[in-house]
From Swiss-Prot:
Keywords: Elongation factor, Protein biosynthesis. It holds the Pfam family EF1_GNE. It comes from Thermococcus onnurineus (strain NA1). This is Elongation factor 1-beta. The lineage of its organism: Archaea, Methanobacteriati, Methanobacteriota, Thermococci, Thermococcales. The keyword Ribonucleoprotein does not apply. One of its GO terms (molecular function) is translation elongation factor activity. It comes from the Archaea. Promotes the exchange of GDP for GTP in EF-1-alpha/GDP, thus allowing the regeneration of EF-1-alpha/GTP that could then be used to form the ternary complex EF-1-alpha/GTP/AAtRNA.
Length: 91
């Protein structure tokens, strides 16, 4: 694993509760640029059966690493209603 020193949490909301979260998670993992790492993915129940995916994305505190870039890529995936960077922290 590369020497990452940041973790960004990106919360992804699916378009509706009937979206297959396993398939959506795999599609989202596939669009993360290679320079980033992935620590884990959590599922967060929201309401009325809707579940958000929280991606813990690893990066570096240097030019070329933008969590907004990753969120923008997530928003382009089918069945994604929204993707927002919640936090970025040093590790």
């Amino acid at each position: 694993m590369a020497d990452y020193n940041l973790v960004g949490v990106i919360k992804v909301m699916p378009t509706d509760p009937d979206v297959n979260l396993d398939e959506l998670e795999e599609k989202l993992k596939a669009v993360i640029p290679e320079k980033f790492g992935l620590a884990k993915v959590e599922r967060e129940p929201i309401a009325f059966g809707l579940v958000a995916l929280k991606f813990y994305v690893l990066g570096r505190d240097e030019e070329g690493y933008s969590y907004d870039e990753v969120a923008d890529l997530f928003r382009q995936v089918e069945n994604v209603e929204s993707a927002e960077v919640e936090t970025v922290s040093r590790i």
